[in-house]
C-alpha cells in the first residue's frame, strides 16, 4: 500500500483501468479490541452496519469475526421485483427480473482478493427470506406479510474489518468498484479515507452504556392457538397421505414488544446461546439478530456443502449423563427418521445444481455438542 495521500499502486491503477474492482488493505496489530467493543464504536446505530461472529461448538471462539459498513450499493427484492440503491438511500426499480438483476450485481462485484485474505473480505452481505424460493418454484399465492419487510436485502460494503483471533490482528479492507464512476486516483483516495475514518472511530473510547439491569422477560404471543395448531397438523397429515408432500415445517412467529437497544438484545443472545454463526444486521428501519449452529449451504471452489442438523437433546449435567443422552438420541427411531429425511432432501437439493454422479455423503449421524444442546449432524 502506498503512503496515505500518494498515488495508487501500479497494480491498483492497472486493474482499475481494466474495469476490475480493487481493494486497499491495512493491518492493525490489536489483541485488546473485541468484535463487540469495536462494533459499539464503529457500527452501533449505523444503517447497514453488520457484525458476524463465530463461536465454534458453542465454546471456542472461531478464527474470524467481521464488521461491515458503508455500502456503495444496496439491492433488495420484494414480490419478485428488485430495486437498487447506489449508496444514497434512494432505490430505483431494476429493469430486469430479480434473478437477472442479482446476477448482474454479483458479476459487477466479483473481485480477486490478494493472497492471505479470507474469502469474506469483500463482496455482498445480506439476507434472503424464505419467500425468495418463489423465484424458483411455482408455489401459488404468497401468504400475508404482517411485517411488511423485503424478501431479500444485499449490501456491498466498501469497508470490511476482519478480526483474526489467531494472529491477533484486525485486517481492514476497503473495496472500490469501477461502476461508481471514479477514476483510479479518486477511487484510491476514497478507499484510503475510509480506512482512516474507520481507524479513527476504532481508537475512540467506548461510549457510555446504560447500566445493566435485571428485567422480566417480555410476554411472547403467537397468532396461532393450540387448537389452530392442531388443525394445521391434521391438514399436514392429510397432504402427506394424499402424496402432495412428505415433510412440512409448521412454523409460526412468536412476537414480543421490545423497547430496548437492539444491539443489547444481540449481546444478551450471544451470551446465552453462543454458536458458530452469530449475526447482528442493522438495516436502519429494522434489525436482525441470530445465533445458529448450522450453515444453510456453502459454495467454495466449485463444491457445494450442506450440513443438515436434526435431532436434539439437552446437554447432561455430568459427562456420564451427557454420553447417556447422546446414546439415547442416536437410538431414537423418530430422531433418526427425521434426520435421514433431511439428509435425503439435502442430497436432492445439491443434486439439482451439481454434475451427475458427484454428490456424496461425507459424514453422517455424528453428534455435535453446543452450550445447552446436542444435535445429530451429517
What are these regions (language model features)?
Residues 1-378:
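Extended alpha-helical targeting/anchoring segments
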Amino acid at each position: 500500500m502506498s503512503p496515505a495521500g500518494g498515488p495508487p499502486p501500479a497494480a491498483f491503477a492497472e486493474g482499475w483501468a481494466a474495469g476490475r474492482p480493487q481493494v486497499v488493505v491495512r493491518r492493525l496489530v490489536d489483541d485488546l479490541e473485541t468484535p463487540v467493543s469495536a462494533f459499539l464504536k464503529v457500527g452501533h446505530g449505523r444503517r447497514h452496519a453488520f457484525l458476524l461472529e463465530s463461536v465454534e461448538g458453542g465454546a471456542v471462539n472461531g478464527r474470524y469475526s467481521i464488521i461491515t459498513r458503508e455500502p456503495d450499493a444496496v439491492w433488495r427484492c420484494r414480490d419478485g421485483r428488485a430495486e437498487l440503491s447506489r449508496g444514497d438511500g434512494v432505490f430505483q426499480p431494476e429493469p430486469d427480473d430479480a434473478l437477472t438483476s442479482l446476477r448482474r450485481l454479483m458479476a459487477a462485484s466479483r473481485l480477486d482478493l490478494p493472497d492471505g485474505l479470507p474469502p469474506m473480505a469483500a463482496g455482498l452481505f445480506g439476507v434472503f427470506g424464505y419467500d425468495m424460493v418463489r423465484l424458483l418454484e411455482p408455489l401459488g399465492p404468497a401468504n400475508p406479510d404482517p411485517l411488511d419487510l423485503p424478501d431479500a436485502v444485499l449490501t456491498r460494503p466498501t469497508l470490511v474489518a476482519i478480526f483474526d483471533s489467531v494472529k491477533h490482528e484486525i485486517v481492514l479492507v476497503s473495496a472500490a468498484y469501477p461502476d461508481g464512476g471514479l477514476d483510479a486516483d479518486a477511487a484510491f483516495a476514497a478507499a484510503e479515507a475510509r480506512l482512516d475514518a474507520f481507524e479513527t472511530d476504532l481508537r475512540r473510547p467506548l461510549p457510555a452504556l446504560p447500566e445493566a439491569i435485571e428485567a422480566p422477560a417480555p410476554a411472547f404471543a403467537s397468532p396461532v392457538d393450540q387448537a389452530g395448531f392442531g388443525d394445521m397438523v391434521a391438514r399436514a397429515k392429510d397432504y402427506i397421505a394424499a402424496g402432495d408432500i412428505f415433510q412440512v415445517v409448521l412454523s409460526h412467529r412468536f412476537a414480543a414488544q421490545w423497547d430496548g437497544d437492539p444491539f443489547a438484545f444481540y449481546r444478551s443472545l450471544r451470551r446465552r446461546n453462543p454458536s458458530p454463526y452469530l449475526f447482528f444486521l442493522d438495516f436502519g428501519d429494522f434489525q436482525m439478530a441470530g445465533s445458529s449452529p448450522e450453515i444453510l449451504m456453502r459454495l467454495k471452489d466449485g463444491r457445494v456443502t450442506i450440513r443438515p442438523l436434526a435431532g436434539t437433546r439437552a446437554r447432561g449435567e455430568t459427562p456420564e449423563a451427557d454420553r447417556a443422552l447422546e446414546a439415547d438420541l442416536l437410538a431414537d427411531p423418530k430422531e433418526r427418521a427425521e434426520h435421514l429425511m433431511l439428509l435425503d432432501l439435502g442430497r436432492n437439493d445439491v443434486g439439482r445444481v451439481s454434475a451427475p454422479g458427484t454428490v456424496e455423503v461425507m459424514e453422517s449421524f455424528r453428534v455435535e455438542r453446543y452450550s445447552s444442546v446436542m444435535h445429530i449432524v451429517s
